[in-house]
Amino acid sequence: MTDEEAIGRVIDAMYAMVSGPKGPRDWSRQRDVFHQDARQMRTGLDANGKPWIKIMGLNDYSSDTRDFFAQNDFFEVEIGRRIRVFGNIADAWSLYEARTAPDDTNPERRGINAIQFYRGEDGRWRIMSMIWDNERPGLKLPDLG
C-alpha cells in the first residue's frame, strides 16, 4: 500500500467516525485515527465578520459535539481530496459536504478539512492536526484539479 493510500484510509476512518444517524459516536476509534496529542480546530466568522477559532484536543472534540450528534443525523461526505507526502509528514485538503443523509443532494454546508499527518515509529499514519472552515458568501471551495 502506498503512503497516499494509507493516508486515504485514515481520512475515510475519520469521516466514518463522525458520520451517522443521530445518537452517540464510537470514539474508541479516535486513537487509531488521531495522534494522542492531536488538535482539531474549528474556524469561522462571527456576526461582525471577525475570525474566530476553537482549538480542541481529542476529549474536547468528543465532548463538544456529543449533544449535536445525539440530536442530529449528520453525515460528512468527502467530495474531493489532495494529499502530499514528504518523509514522515503529509498533508491533505479534504473537501466535504455536511448532510442529513448520505445521499442528500442538498448539503447543509460545504468546507475544507486541512489535515496534517505524522508517520509514527509503528509506521502508521495518524492525524496530528486538523483545521476546517466552511463556505460562505465570497468564499467558495477551490478546484483541487
PLM regions and their residue ranges:
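Short, low-complexity N-terminal intrinsically disordered segments enriched in polar/charged residues
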Residues: 1-36, 145
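Short beta-strand segments enriched in hydrophobic/aromatic residues
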Residues: 18, 34, 96-98, 131-133
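Early exported N-terminus immediately downstream of N-terminal targeting peptides
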Residues: 31-49
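Residues that flank catalytic or metal-binding motifs in active/ligand-binding sites
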Residues: 36, 79, 111-113
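Surface-exposed, charged secondary-structure patches
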Residues: 39-40, 50-104
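A short, polar/proline- and glycine-enriched secondary-structure boundary/capping micro-motif
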Residues: 51-53, 102-106, 136-144
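Non-catalytic cap/lid and distal C-terminal segments of serine-dependent acyl enzymes
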Residues: 61-63, 109-112, 142-145
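Short beta-strand edge/turn micro-motifs at domain boundaries
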Residues: 91, 110-141
